[in-house]
Amino acid sequence: MPIFTPPSPALQKAWWKETIVYQIYPRSFKDSNDDGIGDLNGITEKLDYLHGLGIETLWLNPIFASPNADNGYDISDYRQIMPDFGTMEDFDRLLKETHARGMRLLLDLVLNHTSDQHPWFREARTSRENPYYDYYLWWPEEQGHPPYRKSHFDEEGDAWCYNAPTRSYYLHYFARQQPDLNWQNPEVRAEIYDILRFWLDKGVDGFRLDSIPYIAKDTSFPEIDLCKYPDVFPYYSLGPHLHDYLHEMNREVFSRYDCTTVGEGSKTSPEEGWKFIAPERQELDMLYHFGAADIRNETEADDPATGIPYSLLALKRMYAEWDAAVGDGWPTIYLGNHDQPRMVSRFGSDTPEWRDLSAKMLTMFLLTMRGTPYWLAGDELGMANIRFTRIEEYDDIDTRNHYRKLLREGRDTEQFLREQQEIGRDNARTPYQWDGSRYAGFSVAKPWLRVNPDHTEVN
């Protein structure tokens, strides 16, 4: 009798291996109420268009209540919808209509930090004795100034912010309005698992988990020795118990639902990346690494994102290394997102002569690799970088804070603005170009971010 050998995990079918994920930046997709801001009802209006494209899964950037210091990545209430985007009833309708077309919906959740306006932090910052104090990471003033850590978005560059009522510094690896959660506290993890269940019980099909390697830190905060350890990333993330936390989250939540998970793993190496998605480890399904975003030109010393062409050889080698490293895990394939330049500008050519061919070539690349392909809304049109010329045109907190820092230090802001034309995050966040009308069919009101002037030709 022949012996049946089950297929390897990499060959086992799963809906999230056979789908195309289409990323929607809700603020920029479609405005349904004429206030210049995209919203949930605008997405619902365009579901037939997306279904006609062959899109099977939507990923929405954060839609939760937020003061918008970082466009929704500073969440003040995980169970409420941001008023700019609509109501919970609007979300329920969007979810129902998405499922009615045989499509699925993923939500973008930020679990490394909250807004400083979240009720947890508003309580935590009042007193060391407050039970919510241990929901966050602090350094008491009696121990002196904490060891240096760099903030990604803070204008001063320091990831520690002093809080007088508690006589201590709180940690924020991103903006000071985004205090980092203390995942070592089991009460924090229990709260997060309840949030995940809330949305899964509503029927969402999974999550993209923002900055997931950052949830675990070495909270002794050793001094960074750049001579001994030039790669500083392990000082910030990939800390003790990271994979214990992810396994626990899978066991307590994800394994009980028909859902998928993809973690954002910036700066994660292929050797580390497989740990997140190896089927036998039961953590996440996919990892959204930044290999393509970090590609360098092997013949130039400068950063390729400032206009120097990338190395095709390096791009091919990077994807080959990741494919080999993840083994039976399942990779992701993407060339752009809301934090990166437009893919046709970064990896192809956005000149009139080559834009169309570049967009088609890059899309073919995404669809022919092993792994789940991710598109950013507008990639199918060949939407390109907008190339703002004045700082006032930018909305992004990272760009604006960096500019102020350079201005204060008397450094070259004109060169910085030229670089932002190539690498700035707002390049990917301009309103979707539905048609050639004044505001590209996105809205009848002035949009929150300027429409790319090429929308009369590219729509």
Per-region residue spans from a language model:
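Active-site and adjacent substrate-binding regions of carbohydrate-active enzymes
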Residues: 1-459
